[in-house]
From Swiss-Prot:
It is found in: Cytoplasm. This is Tyrosine--tRNA ligase. The lineage of its organism: Archaea, Thermoproteota, Thermoprotei, Thermoproteales, Thermoproteaceae. It catalyses: tRNA(Tyr) + L-tyrosine + ATP = L-tyrosyl-tRNA(Tyr) + AMP + diphosphate + H(+). The keyword ATP-binding applies.
Amino acid sequence: MDVESRLSLILRYPAEEVITVEELKEILQAGYKLNHYIGFEISGFIHIGTGVVSMSKVVDLQKAGVRTQILLADIHSWLNNKLGGDLETIRRVAVTYYVETFKKIIEVLGGDPDGTRFVLGSDLYHHNDEYWLLLMDITRHLTLSQVRHSLTILGRKMGESIPLAYLVYPPLQVADVFALGAHIPHGGIDQRRAHILAREVAHKIRFYPLEVDGKRVKPVALHHRLLPALNISAKPASKEELSELKMSKSIPQSAIFVHDSPEEIKQKIAKAYCPPREVEYNPVLELLRVSAFREERKTPFVIRRPAQYGGDVEVWSYQELEGLYREGKIHPADLKNAAAEALAGLLEPVYKFFQGPGAKLLEEMKNITITR
């Protein structure tokens, strides 16, 4: 595959930003085998933002010839008091439910489930003196102001009462980039600040230098779009506010989980925010984009409508769909029905997995979330 084709795969939806595209093109042209990584907290059921959106970009990177890695961030999750701060439970869930769910979704999206390396944070850090030297070295090159700035809105608002663990978290994220040799650190757009820190220290640290053909380079940060919460009631004022209004596993009505039944998917989408003609911030349109229009269509996507309202509509691309909706030619109810059908179809193999071989994993997760 030539460089332009690889670049096109990496840059396509759901990618929203690359820092920088020029640097990405340079390291692709070098012909060097590149490493990627994306990290996940272990905190509950996996929703489609974490599962489908993130993994679709992992699959794109696989196809572009990049070594993909998923960091199961158990220590980070413990610092953030996920799953009740029970480190043993966090680790068990990470290497069972999270690994198997991600593998199944990668397979469903057309990727190689065995072609991605899964790394438990504890394993990366265990008996690894160089990692801890790297972490300390990173802290030598960061200011308190920089670390505070990299926190979420909530963290920045906490002022002097912020737990120290929250301030340890960003340097850990930065260290992970270099310890995993990740030329392409990847995450939602809400991870941008941490990746900027990694770029700022890249030429200063002494341990785990990031190189391409013996030349030290900065990590190229890849950020994908965040799926907006279904239950939002108004358009966010900024991208930063949008990051606080994304799908959240802690707010079930805001998210569609990868194990949801077709009936549950339909019920949730029926209640979703979907103003007529609104295309800039519309969760339902985003669901269609990630399910029905992720790949170039070989047959038209059909939006079913009663004959008295004009009958079925055939759509070939997301851009065409967006235009029709903006012009008021598709009713929100018809859009919601189409999104429910498309998403349920995409997730059907995942749903069947959790009804069959993955049933025990799902049951254990339900028991854990109930007791927390």
